[in-house]
């Protein structure tokens, strides 16, 4: 007569899998914490300056950052900021993006002096369209 099969307890395997999972989660959180402290080193940060007085909706936008913030990163950051900050359902939007041709496409501003921005955008609602048109003279003005 044989004894019935009884599976071995798997509790130790469960603890091993749980420990490895928690270690991976901790590693990801530590990386996120480290990059948050040095965010500017890894990403482009938008810089905004109001143009045309306190009641104006017109902003001058450019991007700054560390080595990964080249012209492509600046462009993406500027467009992302325009699309998030302005609501075209409230009022139509006009903007232009001027390229600084004296800045190389791939530039690595490692030091505190980031140099000139590769792109500068002027954006505002159509109630301030005249100001946007003046600032964007010589470039294409886009509308949302």
Swiss-Prot record:
| Alphabetized GO MF terms | sphingosine N-acyltransferase activity
Domain of life per record: Eukaryota
Topological domains on the Cytoplasmic side lie at: 1-9
Question: Which residues are exposed on the Lumenal face of the membrane?
Answer: 33-144
The residues that carry sugar chains are 100
Assigned protein family: Belongs to the LIP1 family.
Function, as annotated, reads: Component of the ceramide synthase complex required for synthesis of ceramides.
Q: What is the designated name of this protein?
A: Ceramide synthase subunit LIP1
